[in-house]
Amino acid sequence: MIHQPPAGTRDLLPLEVTQKGWINDRLQSVFQRWGYQRIVTSTIEWLDTLTAGGAIDPSTVIQLHGDSQGLSGLRPELTASIARSAVTRMSGESYPQRLCYRANVFRRPSAGYHGRQVEFYQAGVELLFSGGLLADAEILLLLADCFDSLAVPNWQIILGEAGLTRSLLSPFPAPLREQVKRCLALLDYVSLENLPYPNETLRQQARQLFHLRGNPEDVLAQVALLAQEESAQKAVNNLKSLVELLNADRSGPFPLILDLSLIQTFDYYTGIVFKAVSDHQQNLSILGQGGRYDQLLGVFHPQGQSAPGIGFSLNIEELHESLLSGQTLPTQAAPLDWLLIPLGNNAQIATFSKARSLRNGDPNLRVAIDLGGRSEAQIRTYARDRMIKNLAWVQEDGSVSEESL
């Protein structure tokens, strides 16, 4: 037991830390250029906060021992925690709030999947107290900027609309509606066909819903014929305007697939929902996900006052995997700029002084001192293996002999 980390967790060694740090640093730089400020919330939250008023399944939360104040757990995502903080701690600040984060999250695996990963690393943004077309477009264009800055290969955004999908599902009786919804979420056409529909009209409508994915213009033309409610027609028009805005901002078509069967894991989404995927070397990976949640903030308001919000989270592990075969990630942990070697016990003070001088002269330099026990040949072999750039041999009188490798 003591030789391995707990099931579902893993250690990150220096090269992987360097590469994922490179990804995170570039993402945070993009976030800041778009005006987002970093927020840090607690890893441990009240279970009521994490389940976001019933929107998140409590079974996905790794719960901790409760006390007299209630149950707590490890956050399975950041949106609920940031929404709580924004409503309760930042209510006096001007709106909108543009917040970003980089953090780990924890999710309990499903029954029968012991050993599955439980700790994940994410980076993302939340645009709070602002609704409408421009906010939706900002989030999607920011997401695209993130992928462009990392040179992610073959990425696409799959876009749905939670409110529109709910409207299209409304003709189905309640028990059947949930079954249809599940089949759509799992892309399970066989089960969808075999559901007990009360009439052939609903069966045909379920088939149409299943196939509402593809080129945005084509899908919007199909769904316009199905959208009977006024709210659904409004959602269709908003999607048309959003697609036009996204395409107008880029030199070529925005890499977008419209999929009205897209249903996210977290049920607090009320407007657009989306997943970002990369099809690299015939492996489809989910790089990120997000959407609009215009009711979630009200869960944390003392009077239940709702406010709009939208955001996304990026999966650092999947981004890392998608970039490994390319040329952008660092291929090694940052090497030392200088290795200082004291030549004798009486040279130790002079060596520390030389190291301090180098660090003070350039705060970005990486400087270490050889701790002894190796011959000159062994030191040079070590330096070459570690790609150390410079050696400095320090004499007892403080004189230094430098060499570049």
Curated annotation (Swiss-Prot):
Keyword Isomerase attributed: no
Drop me one GO molecular function for this one.
histidine-tRNA ligase activity
Chief location category: cytoplasm
Gene Ontology BP annotations: histidyl-tRNA aminoacylation; L-histidine biosynthetic process
User: What InterPro entries does the annotation carry?
Assistant: aa-tRNA-synth_II/BPL/LPL, HisRS-like_core, HisRS/HisZ, HisZ
Location of this chain's protein in the cell: Cytoplasm
- Kindly give the CDD domains that the UniProt entry links to this protein: HisRS-like_core
GO cellular component terms given for this protein: cytoplasm
Q: In which pathway does it act?
A: Amino-acid biosynthesis; L-histidine biosynthesis; L-histidine from 5-phospho-alpha-D-ribose 1-diphosphate: step 1/9
Keyword list (alphabetical) reads: Amino-acid biosynthesis, Cytoplasm, Histidine biosynthesis
Misc. comment:
This function is generally fulfilled by the C-terminal part of HisG, which is missing in some bacteria such as this one.
Protein task: Required for the first step of histidine biosynthesis. May allow the feedback regulation of ATP phosphoribosyltransferase activity by histidine.
Spell out the subunit comment: Heteromultimer composed of HisG and HisZ subunits.
Please state which protein family the record places this protein in. Belongs to the class-II aminoacyl-tRNA synthetase family. HisZ subfamily.
Question: What is the protein's name according to its record?
Answer: ATP phosphoribosyltransferase regulatory subunit
